[in-house]
Amino acid sequence: MANMTLTKTPMPEQEPQVRAHNFKEVALGYTAEMAMEEAGRCLNCKKPKCVEGCPVNVRIPEFIAKVHEGDFKAAYEIITSTNALPALSGRVCPQESQCESKCVRGIKGESVAIGRLERFVADWYRENVNAMPEKTVSNGIKVAVVGSGPAGLTCASDLAKKGYQVSIFEALHTAGGVLVYGIPEFRLPKAIVANEVRKLEAQGVEVMTNMVIGRVLTIDELFEMGYKAVFVGSGAGLPMFMNIPGESLKGVLSANEYLTRTNLMKAYTEEADTPVIKSKAVAVVGGGNVAMDAARCAMRLGAEHVYIVYRRGEAEMPARLEEQHHAKEEGIEFKTLCNPVEILGGEDGRVNGIKCVRMELGEPDASGRRRPIAIEGSEFVLDVDTVIMALGTSPNPLIRSTTPGLDTNRKGGLIVDENEMTTRTGVFAGGDAVTGAATVILAMGAGKKGAAAIDAYLKE
């Protein structure tokens, strides 16, 4: 009989006053008993809408049934038949707007905690089994994957399972893409990402780092080297700024740079050689998950005051509610309906404040959200010594500029057809390189679709 409790089984977390001063993972995960209890809430629907809400089509009721039975290994095998990275998606996927939003238990009460259960299964397997996947017999056909973020890793894994000889070309010195440079340790421990990369290598995937495609090699040169198809999953790492006065002052930086220094280069550790700005008061401009990540890192790096400055209201914030909740618990102050108009500096060329104007919401704009309108005469100044711009990112133009015939849209995203083929034959693309900055799970879905399309293309 199903567990008809209306609320999710709570997941243990570090206390806010403790975690705000360390980079250890905030969410501690379910115990086996908690997972089995929560799995009992699943009704095992005959027509599961939750599966329709999953971009990688995990057979959700099936794996949850195995969790309820205590057969965690079988649950893992069900998940990984369609999801190559469950330990990652279980942590950072916005389940509340995807699979869990379709759960019928959410009609009266809370949905089943699908993400927490997926994370539990992946963690249990890593801690108790961690068998490396077997290598599929190679068909001898070479495929190149540019980028090792969620799209690239998923595409490479699916192609390797089909027998292709896959090589990943990663620009940075560590594989993982946004998973290692963008998402903080307290949300996604890097050891977990490294373990997923080791699994890929066990499948026979070659992972080459420090390989900037467009500089070290071009797409055309990859074809000359014998690769029969290329998947571009290079992400969207080009930060956006506001173009307001004062953005060139010392103490203004992009969230992309700030998070890369903190996460990838581990600048928060005593032994790190990478410098990272140490601040007393920080304004993070933006309202997405990246803004929350940057603000929470600033708090952990010793800032006394951290502000989220966002031009719309909290209801319009794109950040996950969980991330907003955690940020507030950790003492971060939200300055909503505020828009920066100038960054102020002293004679030393350093930031000493940010001038903002208060906003009100008008009619919806093209995004579907109500358009913010400045309130005349409402300017005020926040005393800060650091401003972090978390306004989104766009794809880097390097690959496009070095690949004749590769077209992009006005936002820099690669143009693809329904099969993720770009305007160059044999070159496929997916994830943020196409859509601009989006979620990890959508990038994984694009990588999965790209692998299937490449397989079909090479079999023609």
Language-model segment annotations:
Residues 121-137, 195-215, 241-301, 408-419, ...:
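Glycine-rich dinucleotide-binding loop and its adjacent helix/turn
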Residues 19-37, 58-91, 108-135, 262-263:
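Ferredoxin-type iron-sulfur electron-transfer modules in oxidoreductases and energy-metabolism complexes
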Residues 168, 172-203, 207, 295-342:
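Rossmann-like dinucleotide-binding cores of NAD(P)H-dependent redox enzymes
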Residues 141-167, 291-299:
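N-terminal Rossmann-like FAD-binding beta1-loop-alpha1 element of flavoenzymes
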Residues 74, 137, 142-146, 194-244, ...:
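Feature captures the FAD/FMN-dependent oxidoreductase FAD-binding
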Residues 294, 433-459:
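A conserved FAD-binding loop/helix module that cradles the flavin
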